[in-house]
């Protein structure tokens, strides 16, 4: 089963862990991405996320299909992404994957966060302390980013 959600509400890590847990599984692996208070010497106050929601959910479903093709023993996949304002220390993304043994779930979680950042249309703006400046961030993994194009043959 896939448990996918984009929400403006605070993410509940424990609830997603419980959702993906399964009696046939000895492992639930989690990734929790949180807002940190700094970036390149600037003090970060909060993040703001926007998404092309219909396309994001569609892409997340395709990502789940790819995970299941690579790790056939994966049972449940949960991907919850926050939208709107996310203060420092709060979760912006939670990925939880269950499998009978830890190797598959650990590898699948690592793959999922990397692919999520590459392909799912969610955008992040950092707001900085001081003069109220902000900056839209570009993931270097994202295939349409300049950083990606500079480092890959297209």
Curated annotation (Swiss-Prot):
Note in the entry: This protein is produced by a bicistronic gene which also produces the large subunit (MOCS2A).
GO MF, any single term: molybdopterin synthase activity
Residue numbers binding substrate: 101-102, 117, 124-126
EC top class, as a word: transferase
Catalytic function, reaction form: 2 [molybdopterin-synthase sulfur-carrier protein]-C-terminal-Gly-aminoethanethioate + cyclic pyranopterin phosphate + H2O = molybdopterin + 2 [molybdopterin-synthase sulfur-carrier protein]-C-terminal Gly-Gly + 2 H(+)
Family designation: Belongs to the MoaE family. MOCS2B subfamily.
Cited Pfam families: MoaE
HAMAP family: MOC2B
Description of how the protein assembles with itself and partners: Heterotetramer; composed of 2 small (MOCS2A) and 2 large (MOCS2B) subunits.
Subcellular localization(s) per the UniProt record: Cytoplasm
The enzyme's E.C. designation: 2.8.1.12
PANTHER family, A to Z: MOLYBDOPTERIN SYNTHASE RELATED
CDD domains with a match to the protein in the record: MoaE (cd00756)
Function per UniProt: Catalytic subunit of the molybdopterin synthase complex, a complex that catalyzes the conversion of precursor Z into molybdopterin. Acts by mediating the incorporation of 2 sulfur atoms from thiocarboxylated MOCS2A into precursor Z to generate a dithiolene group.
Name assigned to this protein: Molybdopterin synthase catalytic subunit
Keywords: Cytoplasm, Molybdenum cofactor biosynthesis, Transferase
Entries under Gene3D superfamilies matching the protein: Molybdopterin biosynthesis MoaE subunit (3.90.1170.40)
Top-level taxon of origin: Eukaryota
Organism lineage: Eukaryota, Metazoa, Ecdysozoa, Arthropoda, Hexapoda
The protein's annotated pathway: Cofactor biosynthesis; molybdopterin biosynthesis
A cellular component annotation (GO) from this entry: molybdopterin synthase complex
Name of encoding gene: Mocs2
GO BP of this protein: Mo-molybdopterin cofactor biosynthetic process
């Amino acid at each position: 089963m896939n448990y996918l959600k984009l929400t403006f509400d605070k993410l509940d890590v424990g609830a997603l862990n419980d959702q993906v847990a399964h009696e046939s599984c000895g492992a639930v692996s989690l990734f929790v991405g949180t807002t940190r208070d700094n970036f390149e010497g600037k003090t970060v106050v909060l993040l703001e996320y926007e998404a092309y929601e219909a396309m994001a959910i569609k892409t997340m479903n395709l990502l789940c299909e790819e995970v299941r093709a690579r790790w056939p023993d994966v049972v449940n996949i949960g991907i919850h992404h926050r939208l709107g304002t996310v203060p420092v220390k709060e979760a912006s993304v939670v990925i939880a994957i269950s499998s009978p043994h830890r190797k598959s779930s650990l590898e699948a979680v690592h793959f999922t966060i990397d692919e999520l950042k590459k392909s799912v249309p969610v955008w992040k703006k950092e707001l900085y302390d001081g003069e109220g400046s902000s900056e839209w961030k570009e993931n270097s993994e994202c295939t349409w980013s300049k950083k990606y194009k500079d480092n890959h043959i297209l």
